[in-house]
């Protein structure tokens, strides 16, 4: 018996030659195809020796230089709105030392095959302007000549140039430039624009050996190196606190003293807590600007400050101690910002300040109050600068103003004044000692927080504290949310029934910063100038004085006072009729009425009181006699007919005769309460000036009774 061995696939002991052929074809198709890979120039790879075939010796030939391709990326930072310049691609490309002084010196020829020009915007959304750019493929233009291609400063953009556009098809000697890109901005010099990011791809061939300069004499023995000075690192982190007093959300608030603020202090690897001195940079009856002092050791420092301004309040009494009960909003005035200032001999330079703010939604409601009059929720800032301290000194940080008026009060209302704790935001101050040859001064601008808007920020440090004066002379809106229920600032109960009704101690101060009565006079008119009092006024006592800091009359009062001058040309009835005819909404009508009131109020800047009437010669003579020869003593001459009646010898008995009213008394009756108090105070210090002012005073014209009752019906 013989045995048969079958090799291959067997199915039930039966050979399958057709299947074997199919598998053989599949193996051939799955064989790995050879792949050619290009390697970077360097040490040649070791090859395996082939066996078999032609084993003759290898052919020898002249070695050829191998080409390579490299990619370089460089940036042009800190571009302003009006910056200009150019990029010359070749050995003149100083913005990319790795290309100019590095690989370009190792090859005879090069060509740039592509250029990617990107403009990265760092400007705010409200910035304007653009940066124009132009390609010069032959390096023959020295200034920008075409403004066709532009990058918008707020948006940024990118442009790619291929080899045929930048003269990159042919090879260039490594000592000549290939092309040039010129650019120029038309924005403002004070606005930050952004930066350029340039990516180039370079092909190189024919390497060469650069021996460099001849070596000099052998160096002396290297001295023992001195240990490098340690760069100190200091940081302050904390939330300043302030105690305020508030009563109702439609009332003003009272601020306490700032005092010392407790903050975390970090120096190198150690940390603890320290007290930071703080006080008010400026203060008025409507606002107060806080400031904080930070110590600076002797040396040169790079300083970074991050401020996140937010002013929540919390209760100080049980059982809700520490729980938030509202907030104090910020004003939208341009004079409210974070900034720094010099103190104790330090010098600040290279200041960069970016302030942002977040507005409140008009429908946002906190303690039954809305954000419909420009109130702000947050005010943030990032500040960086260099500070040099010849000796141990300090600088100060100034924050946005704390508003005292009811317009910015969003706290819970109580029946009486209660203490509240108010936070003034998170402050982080980092001081990094700046040594020569180090990069500790390099800082990157932090993008604004989501929902924040950039605002105009100062470029110079703040001056010295101004004390009890406004921080800026810019007028600030002071209207209240509910003027009918909110008393004016610094108003006491003096002169009311609670104080006995006495008005003798009332003192009127017209203007917040008025130093003398001359501030109330009008230049260019014949109105008399009241001389200042000979004695300084007594200090104001709380509860016995009343200060008028602002007078903002309404449109109705102005129209009743001078209907001819303050007439806007159309009445409220005309507005209502026009709204109905135009099928407008109630909101449209209200906005038109508000616009009409603004037009009336704007006319106050051009309104001047009427000039006083000419004084008759008789009155002038009477005044001169009264000044030079006052009547003193003496008796009236008795007439011969006195006591003799023309109807017999009867006489009057009982009763008293009514005294005749004098001219001075009649003039006093025309004065308002404020004018009468002014006159009485002046009379105590200078009676002659008070009498002169009284006789030259012209009372305002009487308002028609019909007009007073119906001011919008016109005169009859």
Swiss-Prot record:
This is Readthrough protein P3-RTD. Residues 1-16 have a biased composition (Low complexity). It comes from the Viruses. Residues 1-69, 207-228, 438-547 are annotated as: Disordered. Residues 17-30, 44-61 have a biased composition (Basic residues). Keywords: Capsid protein, Host cell junction, Host periplasm, RNA suppression of termination, Virion. It comes from Potato leafroll virus (strain Potato/Netherlands/Wageningen/1989). GO terms for cellular component: host cell periplasmic space; host cell plasmodesma; viral capsid. GO terms for molecular function: structural molecule activity. Residues 694-698 are annotated as: Involved in the efficient long distance movement of the virus and the periplasmic subcellular location. Residues 475-506 have a biased composition (Polar residues). Residues 210-716 are annotated as: Readthrough domain (RTD). Pfam families: Luteo_coat, PLRV_ORF5. Residues 214-226 have a biased composition (Pro residues). Residues 459-474 have a biased composition (Basic and acidic residues). The record marks 443-444 as: Cleavage. Belongs to the luteoviruses readthrough protein family.
């Amino acid at each position: 018996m013989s045995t048969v061995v079958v090799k291959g696939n067997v199915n039930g002991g039966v050979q399958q030659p057709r299947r074997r052929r199919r598998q053989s074809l599949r193996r051939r198709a799955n064989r790995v195809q050879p792949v050619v890979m290009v390697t970077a120039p360097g040490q040649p790879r070791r090859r395996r020796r082939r066996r078999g075939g032609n084993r003759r010796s290898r052919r020898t030939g002249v070695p050829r230089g191998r080409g390579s391709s490299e990619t370089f990326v460089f940036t042009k930072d800190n571009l302003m709105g009006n910056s200009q310049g150019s990029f010359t691609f070749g050995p003149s490309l100083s913005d990319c030392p790795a290309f100019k002084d590095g690989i370009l010196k190792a090859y005879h020829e090069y060509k740039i095959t592509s250029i990617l020009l990107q403009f990265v915007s760092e400007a705010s959304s409200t910035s304007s302007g653009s940066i124009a750019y132009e390609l010069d493929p032959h390096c023959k233009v020295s200034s920008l000549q075409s403004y066709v291609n532009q990058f918008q400063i707020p948006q940024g953009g990118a442009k790619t140039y291929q080899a045929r556009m930048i003269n990159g098809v042919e090879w260039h000697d490594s000592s000549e430039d290939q092309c040039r890109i010129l650019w120029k901005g038309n924005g403002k010099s004070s606005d930050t624009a952004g930066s350029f990011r340039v990516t180039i791809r370079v092909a190189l061939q024919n390497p060469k050996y650069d021996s460099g300069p001849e070596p000099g004499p052998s160096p002396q023995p290297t001295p023992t190196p001195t240990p490098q000075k340690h760069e100190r690192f200091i940081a302050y982190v904390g939330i300043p606190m302030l105690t305020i007093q508030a009563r109702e959300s439609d009332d003003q608030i009272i601020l306490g003293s700032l005092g010392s603020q407790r903050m975390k202090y970090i120096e190198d690897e150690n940390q603890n807590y320290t007290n930071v001195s703080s006080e008010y940079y400026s203060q008025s009856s409507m606002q107060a600007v806080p400031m904080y002092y930070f110590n600076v050791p002797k040396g040169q420092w790079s300083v970074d400050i991050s401020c996140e301004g937010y002013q929540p309040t919390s209760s100080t009494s049980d059982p809700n101690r520490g729980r938030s009960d509202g907030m104090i909003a910020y004003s939208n005035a341009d004079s409210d910002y974070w900034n720094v200032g010099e103190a104790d001999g330090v010098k600040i330079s290279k200041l960069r300040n970016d302030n942002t703010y977040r507005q409140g939604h008009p429908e946002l409601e906190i303690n039954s109050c809305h954000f419909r009059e420009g109130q702000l929720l947050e005010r943030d800032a990032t500040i960086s600068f260099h500070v040099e301290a010849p000796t141990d000194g300090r600088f100060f940080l100034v924050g946005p103003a704390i508003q005292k008026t009811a317009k910015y009060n969003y706290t819970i209302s109580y029946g009486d004044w209660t203490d509240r704790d108010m936070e003034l935001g998170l402050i982080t101050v980092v001081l990094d000692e700046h040594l020569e040859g180090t990069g500790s001064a390099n800082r990157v601008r932090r993008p604004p927080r989501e929902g924040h808007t950039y605002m105009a920020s100062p470029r110079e440090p703040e001056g010295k504290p101004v004390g009890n004066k406004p921080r800026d002379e810019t007028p600030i809106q002071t209207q209240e949310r509910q003027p009918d229920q909110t008393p004016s600032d610094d108003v006491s109960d003096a002169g009311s029934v609670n104080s006995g009704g006495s008005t003798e101690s009332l003192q009127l101060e017209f203007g917040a910063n008025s130093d003398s009565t001359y501030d109330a006079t009008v230049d260019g008119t014949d109105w008399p100038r009241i001389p200042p009092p000979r004695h300084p006024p007594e200090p104001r006592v709380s509860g016995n004085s009343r200060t008028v800091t602002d007078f903002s009359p309404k449109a109705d009062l102005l129209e009743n006072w001078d209907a001819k001058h303050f007439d806007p040309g159309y009445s409220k009835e005309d507005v209502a009729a026009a709204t109905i005819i135009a099928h407008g909404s109630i909101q449209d009508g209200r906005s038109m009425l508000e616009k009409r009131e603004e037009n009336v109020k704007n006319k106050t800047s051009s309104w001047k009181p009427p000039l006083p009437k000419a004084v008759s010669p008789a009155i002038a003579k009477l005044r001169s006699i009264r000044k030079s020869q006052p009547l003193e003593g003496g008796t009236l001459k008795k007439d011969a007919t006195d006591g003799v009646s023309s109807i017999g010898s009867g006489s009057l008995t009982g009763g008293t005769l009514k005294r005749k009213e004098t001219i001075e008394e009649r003039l006093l009756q025309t004065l308002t309460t404020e004018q009468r108090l002014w006159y009485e105070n002046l009379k105590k210090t200078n009676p002659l000036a008070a009498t002169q002012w009284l006789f030259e005073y012209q009372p305002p014209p009487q308002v028609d009774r019909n007009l007073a009752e119906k001011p919008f019906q016109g005169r009859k």
